[in-house]
């Protein structure tokens, strides 16, 4: 039982809700996933980190997690640490940087791609949220970065 209105109670209800929605999706040939941002790294009632609690209290049969690597880093955590802590739970990877992919140096794409198998990555989505140049040039820089990065090729040749 939880105290009605407490953050812990609300958190428990969300996990139960996600499990139920995920189960219904599975029964209808779909998948249900959750995409993080930086606020999931706040502690709830000074206890667990919200993202950890969600991963630990949702059923992997019903709920997958799409890791947004940029927001993990902005939340002051390591994507690879999460891969190792929760292997197989991140079947979708959302790669993003401050601007064009690989330009800020803050995300650590080499370690992310080298450990994608541990994460359970099946699909990757790339996003450019902000641009340092015209949009099409920004997209080209990001695509070129992915095509030329040796760790991207290495992680998919295994």
Spans of features found by a protein language model:
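Single conserved hydrophobic/aromatic residue that forms the stacking wall/gate
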Residues: 1-5, 9-10
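Generic structural microfeature
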Residues: 3-4, 27, 88, 141
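Active-site groove signature of glycoside hydrolases
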Residues: 6-7, 27-40
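Intrinsically disordered, low-complexity regions enriched for glutamine and histidine
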Residues: 9, 33-35, 64, 92
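An active-site-proximal structural segment forming one wall of the substrate-binding cleft
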Residues: 13-28, 57-58
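Histidine-acidic metal/acid-base catalytic patches
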Residues: 45-67, 71-158
């Amino acid at each position: 039982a939880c105290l009605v209105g407490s953050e812990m109670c609300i958190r428990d209800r969300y996990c139960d809700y996600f499990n139920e929605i995920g189960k219904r999706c599975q029964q209808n040939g779909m998948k249900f996933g959750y995409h993080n941002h930086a606020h999931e790294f706040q502690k709830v009632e000074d206890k667990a980190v919200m993202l950890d609690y969600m991963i630990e209290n949702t059923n992997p049969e019903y709920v997958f997690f799409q890791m947004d690597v940029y927001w993990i880093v902005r939340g002051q955590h390591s994507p690879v640490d999460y891969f190792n802590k929760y292997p197989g739970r991140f079947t979708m990877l959302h790669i993003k940087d401050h601007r064009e992919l690989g330009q800020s140096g803050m995300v650590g794409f080499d370690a992310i791609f080298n450990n994608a198998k541990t994460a359970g990555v099946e699909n990757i989505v790339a996003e450019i949220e902000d641009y340092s140049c015209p949009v099409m040039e920004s997209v080209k820089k990001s695509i070129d970065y992915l095509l030329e990065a040796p760790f991207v090729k290495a992680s998919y040749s295994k």
